[in-house]
Every structure is written in C-alpha cells, then in structure tokens.
C-alpha cells in the first residue's frame, strides 16, 4: 500500500522548505526589477541604450562560472533568458 502524501511529515517539511524558497525567489525577482528600473533610468539620462547584449553575454558567463549545480548550463541559459525577457517586458512601460 502506498503512503498517503498528504499526511507524510517529511514530504510536508520539504514542501514548506520549497515554499520558503519560492517566496525568496519572488522577493529576489522583485528586487531585481527595482534595481534594473534604476539602471534603465540612469542609462536614459546618459543617452545609453537600455538593452546591452554584451552585458547579457557577460552575465551568462559570470553566472555559469558561479554555478555549482545541479542546474545545467542549458538550464541556466533558459533561466537567464526568461528572467531577462520578463524584466524587459515588466519595464517596457517605464
């Protein structure tokens, strides 16, 4: 007979930890948006383009060097692409 996942204490504890990590991730994304908004404003004042493909490439290389796994390089690229695309969309009207 299979265990009931709704009453398994260890599973519940792991889900609570995951939920805490998800909240931390949400906070980090919101903080990132605040910082990028400031960068966008400063770049506008300097007459510099908001999107910088060279900086995005540098960021991927930097994060790839810092990544200790288990996230793969392909997974990192997908995550970063998603975050950058989301950031650009969120700040498009600002």
Residue spans of the language-model regions?
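Domain-level signature for soluble enzymes in the chorismate/prephenate branch of the shikimate pathway
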Residues: 1-94
């Amino acid at each position: 007979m299979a265990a009931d996942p709704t009453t398994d204490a260890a599973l519940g504890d792991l889900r609570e930890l995951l939920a805490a990590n998800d909240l931390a991730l949400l906070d980090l994304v919101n903080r990132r948006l605040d910082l990028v908004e400031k960068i966008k404003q400063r770049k506008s004042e300097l007459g510099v383009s908001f999107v910088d493909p060279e900086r995005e490439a540098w960021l991927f290389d930097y994060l790839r060097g810092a990544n200790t796994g288990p996230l793969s390089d392909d997974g990192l690229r997908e995550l970063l692409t998603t975050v950058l695309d989301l950031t650009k969309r969120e700040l498009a009207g600002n």
